[in-house]
Amino acid sequence: MVHINVLKKFMCVLVVILIALTVCLWKETRGSYYVPLKNDGTQVHRALDKWNLLKSQGLLHEAAGEMGQMPKALPNNQNKVKGITSGAVEKSRKAAEHVKVWDKDSSSRNLIPRLQKVRKNYLSMNKYNVTYNGKMNAAKLSPEQLLCRLRDRVNVTMIRGSDGPFNSSEWQHYLPDKSLNETVGRLGRCAVVSSAGSLKSSHLGPEIDSHDAVLRFNGAPVKGFQEDVGQKTTIRLVNSQLVTVEEQQFLKDALYNTGILIVWDPAPYHAEIHEWYRKPDYKFFEAYKSYRIRHPEQPFYILNPKMQWQLWDILQENSLEHIQPNPPSSGMLGIVIMMTLCDEVDVYEFLPSKRQTDICHYYQKFHDHACTMGAYHPLLFEKNLVKHLNQGTDEDIYTHGKVTLPGFRNVHC
């Protein structure tokens, strides 16, 4: 009987201890959840929930320093905007300290396992016979030095009637008479508009249309999306796959009838034009001719394939690891084309904003993480380079997905 009473007392004490521990744990959990939501940055914390998940993978970094200073790219006087109260300025300052943007030192370790495997497969496949023997980030270049490399080594030209197999009488009827520079003239501020899903609900349309010229990609529409992407199209860069695939309706869709067209096709690594001409990645030449017959007044250029590998070499030599041995993305090609034509280039949603999403295109519902991080193209390394060159602020990237780059004519080496 005595043993039973002792056992009962022991059980009661044990239950009390368990209850006390449960209460303590509940308070601790409750506190850790609610405390961040009590400060002035409530909206910032909520908006950044999914970005914090990416941060744990090392893809994103805090723009502000560990001590909470304003980042150098965002001086305090930028908050002194007419009509904003001092309280609003303080909230804006605190929000800026939590801005999280693309980390220019991102690496393949940041890729999800599936994309890491895809990258390794492309490295071993080496479809374009890449034999790069140059340096790999031996000494990290300053943005100014890198701009000089791009200006001096990437030759942005279009196929001309004097180029190898295109100098026949047959081709003279199809290639434009004027060069691209002659056609567009001197351009001031230009916009490069990606097709990213994060453009949805951005309300960037009026800002995009305020530029002197706008470049868009492939089949990205403006009709129905003007509020977010604008309606002006000066140049449309399309890949050769789109031109040759029947379901894209390239020859029939009125979408392509506006502005200047440029088509590009992947070529073997540093191949001569005649070698690429004999065996293009996609047999788009007949479709090109058909389009020119239907629309003889619309300028339609073929990008010289040498450019893609000149640009790829610079991407590789400024990366610490081997990048995919495939041509740069249309996005990266378009950025460099506009840097050649314009005094200043604003690039929208090439680096993801606070609206970052795995939806690939603003006009479709297809989801894939590769659209942000890259699979076939060395997109991750392209974004590292663009972030390094950015002359705008991290706040511009976070809020608008906007990167500002100088035109090459304003680069002084």
UniProtKB/Swiss-Prot annotation:
Name the organs or tissues of expression. Answer: Highly expressed in testis, brain and liver and to a lesser extent in lung and heart.
Return the broad EC class. transferase
Per UniProt, subcellular location reads as: Golgi apparatus, Golgi stack membrane; Secreted
Q: Which domain of life is it from?
A: Eukaryota
Positions of substrate binding: S195, N218, N239, S329, S330, G331, C360, T372, Y376, H377, K383
Member of which family? Belongs to the glycosyltransferase 29 family.
Task: Please state what the protein is called.
Answer: Beta-galactoside alpha-2,6-sialyltransferase 1
Q: Which organism is it from?
A: Gallus gallus
